[in-house]
A protein has these predicted regions:
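Conserved NTP-donor binding/palm subdomain of two-metal-ion nucleotidyltransferases/polymerases, i.e.
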Residues: 1-127, 133-417
């Protein structure tokens, strides 16, 4: 199917993904479309969206329309992603062995946990190894990582500590990403408090590990998606993660018994429904009854946002950075002003980068000035964008995100209507 609101090349990328996820359901492209397409742009778009292997696997049947140069570059890029996947998977395998040997409970988040729902798990591109441990074991596990050759990397974040190996980046989570402020955040923490008690044992060719049980995995994906969408930006890889999860589990009772009642409780139901229907419309996956009424125009706007930004906002850095005016990476929804978001985000950044502030609040003004002048210097050097220059991008993005009602209770949504 070809969608008029998207370019030929974007339509082909979507077709290639549908063909990869559901080969028996998706027909082929017409000769006219293949001949008119810019296949280099198709390749580049798949790369910007972090889905080059899936797209290349399906594109092989259209090789006669793709120049040898482009085909070989796509092949080489896919090979490089495969090599990265192997390194990351090996790093995870060694990490799991260390944790299990020492008796630490853990869960692998996203990454290979998400890939396990794909028809071909090896086609899902990997980045970091994200894993969750008990919060009070964070220091012990951190020391264990250092003992085994890892180095602490960067400053602490609100939910994880990063470590670097020679071959991979590890993120030691003491909390999952995307948990909001306020009452919704407390409800999420209460929902996830027993997350480490069980777990889903996953056996892949790259190694065995423990992942979250399905209701937890679903919530982790939703929190992660909105965290990045309202942050630097979401890519098609994230959308494929959700599509594959829904496709594999749509008929499981946990949706009606556990997950959907909870996302309604915290104000994520509209978001979940829109993302699910977006997957159904454009990636060909199942659309459960609970998502059938999601606004198709909003779904189209969400996909347009994904195409404009690319994976982690890599297609347009200014647009990605405009997130500082929209929301603090989704933690407070989208109901605050640009000034509030800018100031609140700046405070959170300073607090994370300079932990000494938490011990002596009098240091805050000092580090506010340090970070403020640092940003000003980078801005004058042309290495950062002025918040004023990002207002138009922020307004355009926020107009879409407001329709998703992230962390808004249904009563409030009805009042707004």
């Amino acid at each position: 199917m070809i969608y008029s609101e998207f370019t030929t090349e974007q339509n082909i990328v979507l077709h290639l993904l549908r063909r990869n996820l559901h080969p028996s359901k998706e027909g082929g492209l017409s000769k006219e479309l293949c001949e008119s397409a810019d296949w280099n742009e198709v390749f580049l778009e798949s790369l910007r969206q972090a889905v080059p292997i899936m797209a290349f696997d399906s594109a092989a049947e259209y090789r006669e329309y793709i120049s040898e140069e482009i085909f070989q570059r796509w092949l080489m890029t896919s090979g490089n992603v495969f090599q990265t996947n192997e390194r990351v998977a090996q790093a995870q395998k060694e990490l799991v062995a260390i944790l299990e040997k020492e008796g630490y409970r853990y869960l692998i988040l996203k990454g290979l946990a998400a890939a396990s729902y794909y028809p071909r798990p090896e086609f899902r591109g990997l980045g970091d190894v994200d894993f969750l441990v008990e919060a009070d074991k964070t220091k012990e596990v951190g020391k264990l990582l250092v003992k085994n050759g890892c180095k602490k990397w960067g400053c602490a974040h609100g939910h994880h500590i990063a470590y670097q190996r020679s071959d991979a980046h590890l993120e030691l989570h003491f909390e999952v990403a995307g948990i909001p402020y306020g009452d919704a955040g407390e409800r999420v923490r209460a929902f996830l408090k027993d997350m480490l008690e069980g777990g889903r044992k996953v056996a892949l060719s790259t190694g065995d590990f423990v992942a979250p049980n399905e209701p937890y995995h679903g919530l982790v994906l939703l929190l992660h998606m909105q965290h990045h969408m309202l942050g630097e930006g979401l890519g098609l890889r994230h959308l494929c993660d959700w599509a594959c999860f829904v496709e594999r589990t749509a008929n499981e009772p946990f949706w009606q018994e556990t997950l959907l009642p909870f996302v309604k409780e915290i104000g994520l139901f509209t978001y979940a429904a829109v993302m699910t229907k977006t997957c159904a419309l454009y990636l060909g996956t199942t659309c459960p009854d609970w998502a059938a009424d999601a606004d198709e125009q909003v779904c189209a706007e969400v996909l347009d946002d994904i195409f404009k930004g690319g994976n982690f906002g890599g297609k347009d850095i200014k647009r990605a950075k405009s997130a500082m005016l929209i929301s603090e990476r989704g933690k407070g929804g989208t109901n605050h002003s640009k000034t509030y978001n800018l100031c609140h985000g700046f405070h959170a950044y300073t607090r994370a980068k300079h932990p000494s502030c938490q011990k002596c609040f009098l240091l805050y003004p000092v580090f506010y000035m340090v970070e403020g002048f640092r940003y000003l210097g980078l801005m004058l050097a042309g290495k950062r964008h002025s918040p004023f220059a990002m207002r138009a991008d922020a307004d355009e993005r926020k107009a879409v995100y407001d329709k998703l009602h992230v962390f808004e209770k249904e009563e409030k949504q009805r009042e707004e209507k």
